[in-house]
Amino acid sequence: MTGKTVTRADLAESVFRKVGLSRTESAELVETVIDEICNAIVRGETVKLSSFATFQVRDKNERIGRNPKTGEEVPISPRRVMTFKASNVLKTRILKAHVTRKVKLKPQNPTP
């Protein structure tokens, strides 16, 4: 893992370099796409981005949990959660990148 976090500004810069829009237009484009995704999720719609992932809101029922320190049972309120499910295409890309990185890091045995 590289430890780098990709920000909105990074995405806008990438759009600027690859698409040729101005920096301002690139930032506006990134903001618009993120806003549209967020608005759809808030409305309870599923957002499916082919070859990337699916974002979905799910309702969780009330349930009984347990305090790990005391063992005491505590009720957990019903709530809505957002899930992110990576597509098989993305999962494959991640696996290939991991395998490639492992091969590069593997120490070479010197030949006698």
Curated annotation (Swiss-Prot):
Keywords: DNA recombination, DNA-binding, Transcription, Transcription regulation, Translation regulation
Gene Ontology molecular function: DNA binding; structural constituent of chromatin
Annotated PROSITE patterns: HISTONE_LIKE (PS00045)
SMART domains: BHL (SM00411)
Pfam families, A to Z: Bac_DNA_binding
The keyword Transcription regulation is assigned to this record: yes
One BP term from GO: regulation of translation
Coiled coil: none
Gene Ontology CC entries for this record: cytosol
Assembly, per entry: Heterodimer of an alpha and a beta chain.
Task performed by this protein: This protein is one of the two subunits of integration host factor, a specific DNA-binding protein that functions in genetic recombination as well as in transcriptional and translational control.
UniProt record similarity statement: Belongs to the bacterial histone-like protein family.
Record-given protein name: Integration host factor subunit alpha
